[in-house]
Amino acid sequence: MDGLRTDGGAAGAAPASSSSSSSVAAAAPGQCRGFLSAPVFAGTHSGRAAAAAAAAAAAAAAASGFAYPGTSERAGSASSSSSSAVVAARPEAPSAKECPAPGTAATAPPGAPALGYGYHFGNGYYSCRMSHGVGLQQNALKSSPHSSLGGFPVEKYMDVSGLASSSVPANEVPARAKEVSFYQGYTSPYQHVPGYIDMVSTFGSGEPRHEAYISMEGYQSWTLANGWNSQVYCAKDQPQGSHFWKSSFPGDVALNQPDMCVYRRGRKKRVPYTKLQLKELENEYAINKFINKDKRRRISAATNLSERQVTIWFQNRRVKDKKIVSKLKDTVS
């Protein structure tokens, strides 16, 4: 019996040792498979612990003297299943991770085109590719070192996320990038329109603009001041730079003229002659109803009247005589 127990124990120990070696062999391929990935220490220790537990169970069965026929097979299967479970439970790291070559750019999925953008490293400007679903070229914004638009970097002021929302053809990107300008004191780009002066608006969109019509000195703004149906300033010699024309609005009209004929149409207000002037004119008319140039000048100097006023008075005086004569004829007849 002792010999049989010894043989059975040896037979049980042999499968146990073979199972432990198979478990170690099963664990070894897992380690070789994960050579490029992070090592999993927990899985290795658990596999070794399972092999040691199987060997201890076989040794205990041999020591008790009852070597059941399926003990070694169950121990070997348990160790192999534990090692396979460890290999299956360990996450497989991406050992074949694709690293782009130094001279090539990272490839994007075929369905999503690449969006060009750049970074400043030192004194150079490098472009990369970024999948945003926008049809832009890889080097759309690539230029010489210190590439900028208007003296400022593109990626600092241009909103790349805004470009992703709208579909822009690849051939229009360089042209559009040239049209965008930047002010030094403003952080947002504005669209430059050639042929116009760049000015910053000081009025808001809802604020009304009040523009007053300011007339120049000596400018006769008839239509702006009073309209065509109103009275017209009728002074013979209009003074230049008068305060009356400084304002173009009817409410601001200054009524400080001495003759008060601002709103009169036609002749100026009649000024009656003095008795001395009338006496001198009547004496000259009694001598001769018609005057010549020399006589007109002499009367003008004596009466302090203009030559035109003297001429008009003589005309009116002749018309008055005709009326008197016509009335006398009517009374006689």
Swiss-Prot record:
GO terms for biological process: positive regulation of transcription by RNA polymerase II. It holds the Pfam family Homeodomain. This is Homeobox protein Hox-D13. It comes from Carollia perspicillata. It comes from the Eukaryota. GO terms for molecular function: DNA binding; DNA-binding transcription activator activity, RNA polymerase II-specific; DNA-binding transcription factor activity. Residues 12-24 have a biased composition (Low complexity). Residues 266-325 bind DNA. The lineage of its organism: Eukaryota, Metazoa, Chordata, Craniata, Vertebrata. Keywords: Developmental protein, DNA-binding, Homeobox, Nucleus, Transcription, Transcription regulation. It is found in: Nucleus. Residues 1-24 are annotated as: Disordered. Its main location: nucleus.
